[in-house]
Design a protein with these regions (language model features):
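Cofactor-binding beta-sheet edge motifs in enzyme active sites
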Residues: 2-20, 28-765
């Protein structure tokens, strides 16, 4: 195994191939690893930065680029803080042998983690100041009189010394300075520029190498054989049923896990199809048509996020009380390419090439599955098909490692489309109920919110391989979902899942951390057992909650014939959220939308509004959606999105714009067409006919984006802000166009027509 020192010494050659091949892209992650930390001490500068004899710089990060563009943005960050050119920086991402442990790439945390005063940016700033100090000694000058630029330090009299001459290929042997000076925005020469994606040339020319392209000498091919239905248990495997297949290497059976290994992909596919397994039947699945009612009847683990204690009394005194119930289906990641990993498990060392968003947690879980210490496992991130959440990336890595251990040779495993779509961790199904009381002037005087969330599993973390299907089949249990009653809230509200509407004061734990003014408030959540595996899908629970919160806010405004924007501003106190609300309304030339919808022939037009303080303080967005609804077919067609986003200082406007626009389109797909289906035994949406998403020939609406950048604020996440507000804005636009309120996503043509018919019947009654 190559040592980190050898790796960094040869980085000038190695990273070029990493960049062009795509083997080094960043992840979004939550925090540090604590007791699971890597051998790279995050408090030491040498864990992050190395300057080479040729003047190039290697920077190591535990945040990987999954397609969201942070490879480019964080290369800019290092170049800016170190005062070197963009071309001089070689960024290494997510390799447990060489990069620090920054947890998982998730939650829109990559930029907050590495951009703000910590981790990568602070390390680069520390390195710059250390080099200035070395140059001061070299020149016999005071460091404050020196300037750094283009990989060199210049003295007032014009003398110049290159970084390579000061330290080239040697270690800094310094701690990361928590007080190192960060370069201010008015000093930026690389950050803040619309630099095209550094991986784009390889992507558009077809030379980018995804994990599916990884090849290892002596590699075999694997396939897994999953149970035929949910909850089935393995009884027996007839290995004789595949003995006639040429090139078959081994059948691996462990607990309920079954896999085959062969010399060729074709032979592995044949063996997986032909292998005879006997399974016990699983329990019947709840009927899909009554699933949400079923969900609300299950035992639950309850939590009170806020509870002022007076909601019932305030509702009883209100001039008017409105109620609504919203539902959100299971949805899947729907990655275009199925998950793939390559594992090489030897007696003393295991290496896994994986598309995981969590290299160190994945290393820990693989070590558990292989019954060996984590230090003997190396996980190297290689980008897979687009995900932003938890598709089969972790599970396929576990499977590949177990198969490789079983045969003693490298194994490449790629899931079938059915493996992927039947067994991935779906986005959670939810039921959300609102009750709100209005005063005589129409303002909200009390709001009660209750939701039910279907949960089973999640990210495996460092010690929960059973949170995905592979670990469960290998004998590990997912996180406990034992029912428990709610206790009075004692923690301060952070609103990480946007469960609490933006208009609540959010008082808990001795502080009011909400964005709004409603002080008679209660939010009760029920976590119930899901029949399917669940986990993070871009904007996990945030999109579900914001859909319900923002559509209900629109209902309240409509009930008193108030302008939706004015009504929101009436109840908002957070200045950054108010800022994007006003910016979006101004850009869209918003006028009073009460009764604004118009109809011409079979088409009705309307516009809707929605806003969010993502996770309470991790990005702010407000969206105006203009739509056309065909009243004969029920088809909803967005024609324009106008969005305002505040994510603080912007590393790369081009990359941010890509994230915002991509989020709007994915949000449109999830709002209009995406839904997992099942029968009594299994998931039935296991191909692109059964699971619909926006097609490549979809007519993309016009998009106008406004960036709001307040002074003196920290960088926040951006990758999940726009998707979060899209379904609510579309639902509100449909109502504005037709008078029909859709409370169940997705807004399929059948549901739109049913809502139109119900509205017509109500008006005729």
């Amino acid at each position: 195994m190559i040592s980190r020192r050898e790796f960094l010494h040869g980085a000038g050659a190695l990273i070029v191939s990493f960049r062009s091949a795509g083997h080094g892209l960043l992840q979004e992650t939550h925090g540090r690893a604590g007791t699971h930390a890597s051998s790279m001490d995050p408090d030491q500068l040498d864990s992050w930065i190395a300057v080479h004899a040729d003047g190039t710089v290697t920077a190591c990060t535990g945040k990987c680029d999954l397609g969201q563009g942070i490879f480019t943005a964080q290369t800019q960050l290092v170049a800016e803080e170190l005062c070197v050119s963009l071309a001089a920086v070689k960024l290494v991402q997510c390799d447990t042998a060489v990069t620090p442990d920054q947890g998982s790439t998730a939650g829109s945390q990559s930029t907050p983690t590495n951009f703000n005063v910590q981790d990568l940016a602070l390390a680069a700033a520390t390195a710059r100041e250390a080099l200035l100090s070395m140059a001061a000694e070299h020149f016999g000058e005071n460091a404050s009189r020196l300037s750094a630029k283009d990989g060199a330090v210049t003295a007032p009299d014009g003398r110049r010394v290159a970084y390579a001459e000061l330290i080239g290929s040697k270690k800094f042997n310094l701690p990361v300075d928590q007080h190192a000076r960060r370069r201010s925005r008015n000093e930026w020469t690389v950050l803040g520029k619309a630099v095209p994606g550094l991986d784009h040339p390889a992507l558009v020319t077809g030379t980018f190498e995804f994990v599916q392209n990884v090849r290892v000498q002596g590699m075999l091919h694997g396939r897994v054989v999953r149970p035929p239905e949910m909850g089935a248990k393995l009884i027996a495997v007839d290995e004789g049923s595949v003995r006639d297949i040429a090139g078959l290497a081994k059948v691996v059976v462990r607990e309920d896990f079954v896999g085959v290994i062969a010399e060729t992909q074709f032979a592995a596919i044949q063996a997986a199809r032909q292998l005879v397994c006997r399974w016990s039947p699983g329990p019947l699945l709840p009927p899909q048509e009554t699933f949400f009612e079923h969900l609300q009847q299950l035992p639950s683990r309850d939590e009170l996020l806020v509870d002022s204690g007076d909601v019932s009394t305030s509702l009883a005194k209100a001039d008017r009380v409105l109620r609504a119930r919203y539902t959100w289906p299971y949805q899947m990641h729907g990655s275009l390419g199925s998950s793939c990993a390559v594992a090489d498990v030897r007696a003393d060392q295991a290496t896994v090439w994986s598309p995981t968003q969590s290299v160190y947690p994945t290393r820990s879980c693989i070590a558990m599955l292989l019954n060996r210490p984590p230090e003997s496992v190396r996980v190297i991130f290689v980008r897979g098909s687009g995900c932003y959440g938890l598709n089969g990336a972790d599970a396929v890595s576990f499977d590949a490692a177990v198969l490789s251990q079983g045969v003693g040779r490298p194994v490449r495993l790629q899931y079938t489309r059915q493996d992927e779509m039947m067994w991935e961790n779906f986005g959670n199904a939810c039921v959300i109920e609102h009750r709100a009381g209005l005063g005589q002037d129409g303002s909200i005087v009390a709001w009660d919110r209750e939701n039910w969330v279907a949960n089973r599993g999640s990210r495996p973390g460092y010690d929960r391989p059973g949170n995905v299907i592979s670990g469960m089949l290998l004998g590990y249990e997912p996180e406990s979902q034992e029912p428990a009653p709610a206790k009075p809230p004692t923690r301060k509200l952070r609103n990480g899942s946007n469960t609490v509407p933006e208009y609540f004061a959010g008082c808990a734990g001795g502080a009011c951390n909400g964005s709004g003014s409603v002080q008679s408030e209660r939010v009760l959540t029920h976590s119930v057992a899901s029949p399917f595996y669940t986990g993070p899908l871009r904007s996990p629970l945030r999109i579900q909650n914001t859909f319900a919160n923002e559509c209900f806010m629109d209902e309240l405004a409509a009930a008193i014939h108030a302008d939706p924007v004015e009504y929101r501003l009436r109840h908002l106190r957070n200045e950054r959220l108010r800022g994007v609300v006003m910016a979006a309304a101004k850009a869209a030339q918003w006028e009073s939308s009460a009764g604004r919808g118009a109809a011409t022939g079979s088409e009705a037009t309307g516009r809707g509004f929605a806003c969010v303080a993502y996770e309470g303080d991790n990005g702010y967005a407000a969206l105006v959606a203009d739509v056309v609804v065909h009243r004969i077919t029920g088809v909803v067609r967005p024609v324009k999105f106008t969005i305002a986003v505040d994510c603080g200082p912007i590393s790369n406007p081009d990359g941010l714009r890509n994230q915002v626009e991509g989020g709007l389109l994915q949000g449109t797909s999830r709002a209009l067409v995406e839904e997992v289906t099942w029968d009594a035994k299994r998931v039935t949406s296991v191909d692109w006919e059964g699971y619909t998403s926006l097609r490549l020939d979809y007519e993309v609406p016009a998009i106008e984006t406004v960036f709001v950048v307040p002074d003196n604020v920290k960088a926040t996440g951006a990758g999940e802000t726009s998707i979060t507000v899209t379904p609510a804005a579309l639902g509100n636009a449909i109502f504005n166009a037709t008078g029909a309120r859709l409370r169940q996503a997705p807004f399929t043509p059948a549901r739109v027509l049913a809502a139109l018919e119900a509205g017509q019947e109500a008006r005729s009654a």
